[in-house]
Amino acid sequence: MNTVNSILINILLRSIFKLRIFHRISKLIMDLSLDNDELETQEWIEALNSVIDAEGSERAHFLIEMMIDQARRSGSNLPYNATTAYVNTIPTHLQQRHPGSPDMERRIRALIRWNAIMAVLRANTKSPGIGGHIASFQSAATLYDVGFNHFFRAENDSFGGDLVYFQGHSSPGIYARAYLEGRMTEEQLDNFRMETKGNGLSSYPHPWLMPDFWQFPTVSMGLGPLMGIYQARYLKYLHDRGIADTSDRKVWVFCGDGEMDEPESQGAISLAAREKLDNLIFVVNCNLQRLDGPVRGNGKIIQELESNFRGSGWNVLKVIWGSYWDPLFAMDKDGLMKKRMEECVDGEFQNFKAKGGAFTRAEFFGKYPELKERVAAMSDHDIWRLNRGGHDPHKVYAAYAAAVAHKGQPSIVLAKTV
């Protein structure tokens, strides 16, 4: 092994674990069984540790980038991979604090979720077969709740307001929130998908059907992401030419992971990066499920989307694990739990959540005796309660705050939910 490659490999091993800069450079690098000089490896790990502790992760990142550049200039072929480890982008100690009342917001969220379900069920009782989506909003409720409570800003005399593209299938939840706020009557909620008599609610967001309620149409699926990109670009156009002050306005686009397979959903993402649309924020509800089955049963949709968007020049924020996982991550000094998370595909994660704590203990933690020992003091219920990041308002708030503050790139939040 030549000196340049040896230096690069040993630095990257530590950076992958602690900085989360890269996920895999190649199987060769990640296969520790090929390490023919463990002492040298340990020396480089300790050296990088020292840089991180003394000068911070930014300096360490710079050194790694210089090493990669030097290796490539020397003729080394280093495959590029745009994915990072299957963990939250923002570590716990860097989370921006949630400023609200978690208990009060949880109660409000529960009422909205209940009313969203009842709107669909009561409509189908009155008119069997009329349809309506229940699961989409239930999985995304926290994502919307944190946005409404802390980030979405309405228009006023001095500010044009933020623009929000709501995922079409989540409309029952948006109606339910409006009802709770007193902006919609019970009669209207009871007439979900029944517009012909003049006092009903449209199936999906559409300003022609409900001009005083919806800003943008987002169905058929995939149109919201595409239009959101061009809306954000238009706001930049207005500001750059002095037509209107849109400098602080944000465009939020909510969509599902299955929806991202629509050709329109990712059709203009390179334009958003090229135009540096830092006024644009995508929020993808990654519940791993579409109408007809898993989105990527034998893969990882979050990793795939991260690769697509990061490779196109976006700022990617992954919100995968909730706060109940934090103590386990703190114990994971050897990276074994992260390794297990990398091994599992989305179909397995769905299985773990569906079959409960005992099954998860045996099949997820049980693969490695060391992992199983770490959860020995936890009940099956405790293991079942280990939450996904998209249901944790603290994790979601931190990601949104980072996205709003980010400059020079559009941002995408990939939130894992049930």
Task: Go through each PLM region and give its residues.
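Cofactor-binding active-site loop characterized by glycine-rich and histidine/acidic residues
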Residues: 100-112, 116-126, 133-275, 298-299
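Long, well-ordered, tryptophan-enriched scaffold segments
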Residues: 286-418
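Cofactor-/ligand-binding subdomain signature composed of acidic, glycine-rich
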Residues: 40-43, 47, 63, 78-126
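Short internal beta-strands
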Residues: 164-167, 280-287
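Amphipathic alpha-helical packing elements
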Residues: 37-77
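Terminal amphipathic helices with adjacent charged low-complexity linkers/tails
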Residues: 75-88, 324-326, 415-418
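Gly-rich Lys/Arg/Thr-decorated short loops/hinges at beta-loop-alpha junctions or inter-strand turns
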Residues: 95-99, 205-214, 249-251, 283-291, ...
